[in-house]
From Swiss-Prot:
There is a cross-link at residues 242-268 (Tryptophyl-tyrosyl-methioninium (Tyr-Met) (with W-96)). It comes from Neosartorya fischeri (strain ATCC 1020 / DSM 3700 / CBS 544.65 / FGSC A1164 / JCM 1740 / NRRL 181 / WB 181) (Aspergillus fischerianus). Homodimer or homotetramer. Binds 1 heme b (iron(II)-protoporphyrin IX) group per monomer. One of its GO terms (molecular function) is catalase activity. This is Catalase-peroxidase. Heme b binds at residue 283.
Length: 759
């Protein structure tokens, strides 16, 4: 008898209590991660159930808070002294790294939940010393309590830091309620070493076990990795926000670094001008820290001992702070006025020729040739240094497109200041969603295209009588009801709880690029929109001032069709509807930005393409998480949408019913029927169900169908709906979940700024 190799790595000593020991994840690492549908609920939130963050923020003495933050900037503490007597550079980096994890593909990351406080972000090599920044802020957070979240405070502090150093910002919006646990839904990469990128790139770098510094790799890796960064990632290395400042994989090549910069910043929604403005503007202030080699740096916060109290990277070099600080391993101060806004960065970038050198920690950086020592020392006023730059700074000079922009900014400082102000605002607010969520006295009045603007309601809304009339007209239009349901779902399910983008409001389903997405059945979409536009035209031409938007009609049509389907199944029920949506124009829609939201898969519609198909069930859970759904909500929606016959291509996969179009619990009844035997149809993506006795073919199904009978937790939920007493509960739960999805983007209704509940 042979002994199989253990399916998991040997683990450090674990307690035999409190969840210790070998876990299901250890045994089956590829198991469906339903835990991401159970996060950020009332169970983990210490605040009262009726706590309203928006109301709390509005009661904040905002100017007093900003005054306290300004005072903190120059209140240097012995336990962590301020460079140049000013914490501005540190706090700008804190805010930047809080927001800079955002990526366009799934909207995850960003500043919106204050996740920098939790693992893994609190222990990333790129966030060394930001643990100290947050501790410097604690007395102010303690003073103002729940009136300002950590998520808002970190961004506001970055703004105040800029203002205190003479820069005029574009504005600030609050409205980021905190979460209370580490986010487990975001994919940060598969590498198992800090700074590694051998999984996200072909020919990548295996990483390092060193902590806290970016030591150039001199021996094992001389070939720059390929340029195809894994989707949805937006960082070149595990544990970095964007790129390696030494250059790709530690190779000091400014041209190659420009490729990485353009890719990663683009995946964070920044164009070339915004990228140049952010790098040049941000590096106008402060310095980097690399006083000594990496072996002086201790464990990161998550690995440090209890006595460290959540701090990490203890530094045994000298005093371990001030002039002895080790953060990135680079030792660069960009300008002669590191606590004042200036054009020095761009002036020096083009004025000097640059020579490759190394920091005291051994990291590649650049020093100005034949330059005078004009750069101040952070802690000794009697000392000066030559100007220094990072490899990625020089990219702004040697990449032709970046150089053109940088020279224009050099010649036109006013354009540079405006571009940096706007790019900084976009960086720090990109994941907040619509302006309806913005709070505070410094919200800028200018409406920006990346905010996905929707016109304000400018007419009387339809009332209950109008709604009833419209529903009757819609149902009598002759359009198959599944087209209305499919269109409503296609519109509403674009919502992402990550960055609060998408949803039915705006009716962008009729505009490029959404109208052309493969997942949106084109004939069904066209016939539904054509019928609804005719209904809208007739209603809005009545002359009584009342109007109805196409966005409202899309949702109303779906609701009316669901009501009819429930009635046809013998379960009359009212599907809620609240008007107030408006229609966006094509000019108000950033096509490139929205193109990133096109789904690879949507298991609710049995849609998956390319590499998504073999993992359709995992994509389904990911989609459910973005829709703020719980496992029961996901389950009931899939079961309902199947019997409503709304597969994106009209196929019968998973349509386990003899009465398609009726809102019944048939999907669950037939899925769990032990008289059906399932077999793989040959590719692991499609399955056939046959009668166990006769062998006759009964059903076909995808992975997104059979997972509800295969996965133990989902099967337990499915059993509730498949039971003899589960039919009415199924209909009620489906309608509740449907209504939730239809209104995920209705921040105008919610009032409260909370993390949407997973019921």
């Amino acid at each position: 008898m042979t002994q199989d190799k253990c399916p998991f790595k040997e683990q450090p000593s674990q307690p035999n209590f409190a969840g210790g020991g070998t876990s299901n994840k250890d045994w089956w690492p590829d198991r469906l991660k339903l835990n991401i549908l159970r996060q950020h609920t009332a169970v983990s939130n210490p605040l009262d159930a009726d706590f309203d963050y928006a109301a709390a923020f509005k009661s904040l003495d905002y100017e007093a808070l900003k005054k306290d933050l300004r005072a903190l900037m120059t209140d240097s503490q012995d336990w962590w002294p301020a460079d140049f007597g000013h914490y501005g550079g540190l706090f700008i980096r804190m805010a930047w790294h809080s927001a800079g994890t955002y990526r366009v593909f799934d909207g995850r990351g960003g500043a919106g939940q204050g996740q920098q406080r939790f693992a893994p972000l609190n222990s990333w090599p790129d966030n060394v010393s930001l643990d100290k920044a947050r501790r410097l802020l604690w007395p102010i957070k303690q003073k103002y309590g729940n009136k300002i979240s950590w998520a808002d405070l970190m961004i506001l502090t970055g703004n105040v830091a800029l203002e205190s150093m003479g820069f005029k910002t574009f504005g600030f919006a609050g409205g980021r309620p905190d979460t209370w646990e580490a986010d487990e839904a975001t994919y940060w990469g598969r590498e198992t070493t800090w700074l590694g990128n051998d999984a996200r790139y072909a020919k990548g770098f295996s990483g390092s076990d060193k902590r806290g510094t970016l030591i150039a790799d001199e021996d094992s890796h001389k070939t720059t990795h390929s340029r195809e960064l894994e989707t949805p990632l937006a960082a070149a290395h595990m544990g970095l926000i964007y790129v390696n400042p030494e250059g790709p994989d530690g190779n000091p090549d400014p041209i190659a670094a420009a490729h990485d910069i353009r890719d990663t910043f683009g995946r964070m929604a920044m164009n070339d001008e915004e990228t140049v403005a952010l790098i040049a503007g941000g590096h106008t202030f402060g310095k980097t820290h690399g006083a000594a080699p990496a072996d002086n740096v201790g464990k990161e916060p998550e690995a440090a001992g209890l006595e460290a109290q959540g701090l990490g990277w203890a530094n045994k070099h000298g005093s371990g702070k001030g002039p002895d600080t080790i953060t990135s391993g680079l030792e660069v101060t960009w300008t002669k006025t590191p606590t004042q806004w200036s054009n020095n960065f761009l002036e020096y970038l083009f004025k000097f020729e640059w020579e490759l050198t190394k920091s005291p920690a051994g990291a590649h950086q650049w020093v100005a040739k034949n330059a005078d020592e004009i750069i101040p020392h952070a802690y000794d006023a009697s000392k000066k240094r030559k100007p220094t730059m990072l490899t990625t700074d020089l990219s702004l000079r040697f990449d032709p497109a970046y150089e053109k922009i940088a020279r224009r900014f050099l010649e036109h400082p006013d354009q540079f200041a405006d571009a940096f102000a706007r790019a900084w605002f976009k960086l720090t607010h990109r994941d907040m969603g619509p302006r309806a969520r913005y709070l505070g006295p410094e919200v800028p009045s200018e409406v920006l295209i990346w905010q996905d603007p929707i016109p304000a309601v400018n007419h009387p809304l339809v009332d209950a009588s109008d709604i009833a009339t419209l529903k009757d007209e819609i149902l009598a239009s002759g359009v198959p009801f599944r087209s209305f349901i499919s269109t409503a779902w296609a519109a509403a399910s674009t919502f992402r709880g990550s960055d609060k983008r998408g949803g039915a409001n705006g009716a962008r389903i009729r505009l490029a690029p959404q109208r052309d997405w493969e997942a949106n059945n084109q004939p069904w979409l066209r016939e539904a929109l054509s019928a609804l536009e005719a209904v809208q035209s007739r209603f809005n031409s009545r002359g009584d001032g009342k109007k109805v938007s196409l966005a409202d009609l899309i949702v109303l049509a779906g609701c009316a069709a669901v009501e009819k389907a429930a009635q046809d199944a013998g379960h009359p029920i009212k599907v809620p509807f609240v008007p107030g949506r408006m229609d966006a124009s094509q000019e108000e829609t950033d096509v490139q930005s929205f193109s990133h939201m096109e789904p690879f898969a949507d298991g609710f519609r049995n849609f998956a393409k390319g590499p998504a198909r073999p993992r359709a069930e995992h994509y389904l859970v990911d989609k459910a998480q973005l829709l703020n759904l719980s496992a029961p909500e996901m389950t009931v929606l899939v079961g309902g949408l199947r019997v409503l016959n709304t597969n994106y291509d009209g196929s019968a996969h998973g349509v386990f019913t003899s009465r398609p179009g009726a809102l019944s619990n048939d999907f669950f009844v037939h899925l769990l029927d032990m008289n059906t035997a399932w077999k793989d149809a040959g590719n692991g993506e499609l399955f056939e169900g046959s009668d166990r006795k006769t062998g006759g073919k009964k059903w076909t199904a995808t992975r997104a169908d059979l997972v509800f009978g295969s996965n133990a937790e989902l099967r337990a939920i499915a059993e509730v709906y498949a039971s003899n007493d589960g039919d009415m509960k199924f209909v009620k739960d489906f309608v509740a979940a449907w209504n939730k999805v239809m209104n995920l983007d209705r921040f105008d209704l919610k009032g409260k700024q909370t993390i949407p509940a997973r019921l």
